[in-house]
């Protein structure tokens, strides 16, 4: 998760909050995510935070562009940004000490699985030798603020592992 703190209605420059910059969040129950860091909402009423989130997490990310190798076949997601969130705007837990910021994630790219089945009326033995995606981008960059993807100019072929059952 990234958090940019700024004055309300200010458009630039937006400075990342050091306590919210690229913090990893983990989950034990698959629903609620927490982090080891301790962040506080600004006290001033005219100071707000923009929240941006992406998956999978990259500890080395230092700007808004996350890079992924497509050969890794991983789900790539970004959250719909939550903009201009101030201390008075957040829902808190019952004791009022923990702010809840609900993020809605969108799939940008997903791992794929291909299943090829022989028709029941074919009696001959068929052997599938190869399945391959040819001439696809080798990598992609995702802007975590917009979800926009940019592919690399480098192309690659992706063999898809074949397992045979009959």
Question: Which role does the model predict for each range below?
Answer:
Residues 1-6, 122-153:
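Short, ordered, surface-exposed loop/turn motifs in non-cytosolic proteins
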Residues 165-166:
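Conserved small/polar residues in nucleotide/adenosyl-binding loops
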Residues 1-127:
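Short, low-hydrophobicity acidic/polar segments
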């Amino acid at each position: 998760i990234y958090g940019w703190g700024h004055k309300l209605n200010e458009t630039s420059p937006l400075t990342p909050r050091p306590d919210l910059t690229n913090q990893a969040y983990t989950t034990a129950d698959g629903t609620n995510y927490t982090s080891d860091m301790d962040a506080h909402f600004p006290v001033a009423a005219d100071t707000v935070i923009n929240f941006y989130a992406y998956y999978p997490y990259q500890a080395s990310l230092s700007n808004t562009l996350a890079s992924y190798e497509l050969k890794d076949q991983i789900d790539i997601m970004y959250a719909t940004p939550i903009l201009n969130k101030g201390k008075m705007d957040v829902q808190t837990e019952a004791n009022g000490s923990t702010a809840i910021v609900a993020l809605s994630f969108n799939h940008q790219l997903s791992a794929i699985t291909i299943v090829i089945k022989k028709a029941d009326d074919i009696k001959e033995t068929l052997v599938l030798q190869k399945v391959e995606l040819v001439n696809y981008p080798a990598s992609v960059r995702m802007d975590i603020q917009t979800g926009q993807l940019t592919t690399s100019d480098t192309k690659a072929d992706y063999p898809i592992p074949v397992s045979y059952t009959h």
